[in-house]
Swiss-Prot record:
Pfam families: Trm112p. One of its GO terms (cellular component) is cytosol. This is UPF0434 protein Mpe_A2486. InterPro entries: Trm112-like (IPR005651). It comes from Methylibium petroleiphilum (strain ATCC BAA-1232 / LMG 22953 / PM1). PANTHER family: PROTEIN PREY, MITOCHONDRIAL, ZGC:162634.
Amino acid sequence: MDTRLMDLLVCPICKGPLTHDHSSHELHCAADRLAFPIRDGIPVMLESEARALDESPSQAAPLSE
């Protein structure tokens, strides 16, 4: 992911900083303990697509109810 883009992106929930996890292709918000997927090089910054960081990617379920 482009570092210039990373400088602009923030968590859509708390507006905090995100970190790029290269191994899981996700952006992580440490404050909310959420991981946002990156699909085809595009970050999916929707709360409904995020997973809790306590889950493994294979166990992930959308957070929306």
